[in-house]
Every structure is written in structure tokens, then in C-alpha cells.
């Protein structure tokens, strides 16, 4: 009997869905090598491989069979996705156009030899970023430049504004995936997109206030408030939004600072200066990558007090997602500062989830962990930290934690799924 690749779900699924991979029709205990590959929209090739052995019943099921080596080892049912590595070094896998899927090619080869063995079977898995029925609406409302993702059905839906960090213009893949779980999500650009400023020299909170107003006035968004999700620089912007703006009910921060960073923040007649940084303290790793961990001064030092975001003004619960091996800045330390400041002002202690061996760029599940890549703005190779297997596990758990937190505070669901890590 010829070997056959079995995929569940068959054919296509959403990127954040697990994929069950099995091979039938092998010889008992036959050694095989499985390979995956995909190309991003710019043609960059990503590949992974792992060696396996069929069981005595002539089958191979990646949920039960450990990898014997290759891009990873051990029981890792989704390893052939998260272990994808770029053919050209320092390329990070991101989805630029969420309206099209990534096509993952899977191959089963005979044997464990370094040279590829005979091709036994192959299959393709198309991984979508828009679940069936999810709608994408470009937003050009006054100065606001964004993309709104709406779940199927009539709504209205609980609303979220999603902000990325300082390396991209409009980044939509996290928002599009989150909309598939019942949220109306606005992926918001704030520089380097269309007619927005090219550089982050000054940031005006009024722009983000208009985005909040847009969401609250949208007929498909359930008021009277929305939530915020921010990563890196987007995280301290979300802290400022939660502290100064009305209509915010919950905030999730992924590896964020408690001080305003990168550029001065303006709001009405107030200016919050940026946290002092010293680029002379940039370090170079043994691999030649830059790490910015030591460039940021301590926000608690007296000369930095004015840069601290007054998060004690916020009337919302916070969830801090922390990579304990974040090499961009001291995310765990910043989360501790936030907790102490909130409690010192009689506020609710924030939920903090710390993930060991996890770096800066915590993406939705099954994205290959980005330990180092060329920063889109700086044009330099930056080291972000993280151990691939642990980081990948953290991404799966964090994605569920984020959804649980938002469902609880936007929909009033009280069941909380505790972290497995």
C-alpha cells in the first residue's frame, strides 16, 4: 500500500489552529523524514524537517511519535511549523496580506539520510488568516489609518484596538486571527503608513483617542467601552491610552515598558518625555547581533520619573505577558514596577504571566519564534532572545490567556483558564 499523508483539518484551516499530521501505509518501524516549507509574500523560503520512525502498525502519528532529530527533537506535534527557519538568515516570518493564506508544503521521504531519500507522499495545508465569514474593512476615518476585522454574524461584538511596536506600519495578522474568536479588532497604524509620519519623533495621544471614538461609534462594536492589546512600543502606548482616555475597559500588554519610550508623548497641554536611552550601551552578541537590553535607563531613577506612564490613573484591569528572556528590554522588571505602583495606589493587582526562555517577539501560535531579525526601521540585525521550543509553547499559552482575559472583561465570562506554564 502506498504511503499517504493525513492532515486534520484536511486541506486548509486557520493559522492559529493546530494541525494533526499522520502518515499511513508505511512499513513497520520504517524510518522516514518529514519536511515542511512555505514562501512568504516576498518569496522568502522557510523550511523545517524532522526524522521519525513508523510504529509496528505501519503508521506514524505526530501526536504520539517523538521526532528523533532534525530541526527539533521530542514530542512536538506542531514542530514542523514552529521550527520553520528562513533559507536566508535574519528574515522574520510575518503575514503582510491577511486576505491570502500561507501554503505549507509537506513531504514524506524514505530514510534518515542526510541526502533526501525517495519521496513517498506529499500534501499541502493552506493556513488562512481570515476565518470563514470574518470581514476586513479598511479604515480611513479622519486621521485614523487602520484595518477593522469583524466576526461573522450581525453583532455587535466586543471591541479591541491592536498596536504593534516600532518596526512596522500597519500590521494586521494578529488582529485578523483574533477576530476569528468573536472580537471586533482594529489593527491601528501610527507611523510609516500612507500619510502618517515616517518616523516616531513625536506621538500625539489625540490620534489614538480618535481611534477609540471610531470604535465606540461603530455599529458593529459593542459599547460602552473597548479593550487594548499592545506589543513592545505599542504596549506603552496602550498604557498611556488606558491612563488618560475614556472608554477603555481592559488592557493586555506583551513585553511592554512602564515608561513612555522612543518619542515624547503629547496630550492636550501635557508632554511625557521619552525614557532616557544610551545607544552607546548597545551590545553585540557573539553572532554579531545587536541587543538593546542595557540601553534603557531605569525608569525608577529620579531623572526618569516624568517618563513613567501614570498607570495608577487607569480604571481597568491589566494583563502583562512577559518573556523572561526578552533581550530588547527588561519586561519582567517593568511588569513588577507596574504591579507595585498599582497596588501602592489601592488598585487591583495586575495579572502577570511570565514565560521562561521566551524572548521579545511573542506572536500568535505556530509562528516560528523570531530570535533575531533585521529591524524594519533600524535596518540592523537585532537579537530578541528566546529558546525556540519554549518560546513556541509560550505563544500557544499566551494566545489562550489573552482571549480568556478579553472574554472575561468584555463579555463578563468569569471562567479563567490558568496558564499551563
Curated annotation (Swiss-Prot):
Keywords: Cytoplasm, Hydrolase, Peroxisome, Serine esterase. One of its GO terms (cellular component) is peroxisome. Pfam families: BAAT_C (PF08840), Bile_Hydr_Trans (PF04775). Pathway: Lipid metabolism; fatty acid metabolism. InterPro entries: AB_hydrolase_fold, Acyl-CoA_thioEstase_long-chain, BAAT_C, Thio_Ohase/aa_AcTrfase, Thio_Ohase/BAAT_N. It is an enzyme of class 3 (hydrolase). Its EC number is 3.1.2.-. SUPFAM superfamilies: alpha/beta-Hydrolases. The keyword Cytoplasm applies. A motif (Peroxisome targeting signal) lies at residues 419-421. The active site is at 232 (charge relay system), 326 (charge relay system), 360 (charge relay system). One of its GO terms (molecular function) is fatty acyl-CoA hydrolase activity. One of its GO terms (biological process) is acyl-CoA metabolic process. It comes from the Eukaryota. The keyword Transmembrane does not apply. It catalyses: pristanoyl-CoA + H2O = 2,6,10,14-tetramethylpentadecanoate + CoA + H(+); phytanoyl-CoA + H2O = 3,7,11,15-tetramethylhexadecanoate + CoA + H(+). Catalyzes the hydrolysis of acyl-CoAs into free fatty acids and coenzyme A (CoASH), regulating their respective intracellular levels. Catalyzes the hydrolysis of phytanoyl-CoA and pristanoyl-CoA, two methyl-branched fatty acids derived from phytol, that enter the body via the diet. Belongs to the C/M/P thioester hydrolase family. This is Acyl-coenzyme A thioesterase 6. It comes from Homo sapiens.
